[in-house]
């Protein structure tokens, strides 16, 4: 009995480590968005390219480590290469980086961090507010999706509650920063994206309710 419990715990730890390695493999290249090189001239991208090269090597190492963990556990090659949690890793990487960008923008608004352009008070890690607002507008519907996809609080697990809280906090931070960017196109994009997410979830709720009738 005790041996079975130990095996179960080892299996859970292995699965958690594999998911974490997959997340790091996805998040490291996407973290390029947060790389700034204020010491270089405007338009120079050599710093970003250097970071991207290192991130790709780190990502490859994480993928190899995850495959080895699964191989030692006796998993099939199909399971190892399926990368079943890829979409979740991408979503949560964008949410994490979107939260960092939102906090970055708030710090610039209140004068705790320097802007990326002398003409604008709010740029995040970007050179001007336009791309910054577009990035936040892209992340906001993802936050909304993760907040409402599991419904209410009563019947979900603690881990899903933590996911809802994290997505909700990042969404609120983005809502605090996005109006200050003064980018109407980003406002429209964020609004249309959120409306689309709400419509998709309403359709899924209706289909679930019809199946229970």
Predicted segments — roles?
Residues 1-10:
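Short, Lys/Arg-rich, polar N-terminal cytosolic tail immediately upstream
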Residues 9, 15-34, 54-73, 79-118, ...:
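Alpha-helical transmembrane segments of multi-pass inner-membrane proteins
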Residues 35-43:
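Membrane-interface helix-loop junction between the first two transmembrane segments
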Residues 44-53:
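Interfacial loop-to-helix junctions that mark the boundaries of transmembrane helices
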């Amino acid at each position: 009995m005790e041996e079975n419990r130990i095996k179960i715990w080892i299996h859970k730890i292995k699965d958690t480590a594999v998911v974490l390695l997959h997340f790091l493999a996805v998040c490291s290249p996407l973290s390029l968005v947060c790389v700034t090189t204020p010491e270089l001239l405007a338009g120079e991208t050599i710093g970003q390219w250097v970071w991207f090269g290192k991130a790709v090597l780190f990502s490859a190492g994480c993928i190899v480590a995850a495959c080895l963990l699964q191989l030692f556990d006796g998993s099939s090659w199909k399971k190892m290469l399926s990368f079943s949690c890829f979409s979740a890793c991408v979503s949560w990487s964008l949410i994490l980086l979107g939260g960092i960008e939102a906090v970055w923008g708030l710090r610039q608004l209140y004068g705790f961090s320097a802007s990326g352009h002398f003409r604008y008070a709010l740029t995040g890690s970007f050179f001007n507010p336009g791309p910054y607002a577009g990035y936040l507008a892209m992340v906001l519907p993802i936050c909304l999706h993760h907040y409402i996809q599991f419904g209410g609080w009563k019947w979900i697990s603690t881990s899903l509650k933590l996911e809802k809280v994290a997505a909700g906090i990042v969404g609120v931070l983005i809502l605090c920063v996005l109006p200050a960017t003064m980018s109407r196109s980003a406002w429209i994009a964020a609004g249309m994206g959120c409306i689309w997410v709400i419509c998709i979830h309403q359709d899924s709720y209706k289909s679930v309710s019809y199946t229970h009738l």
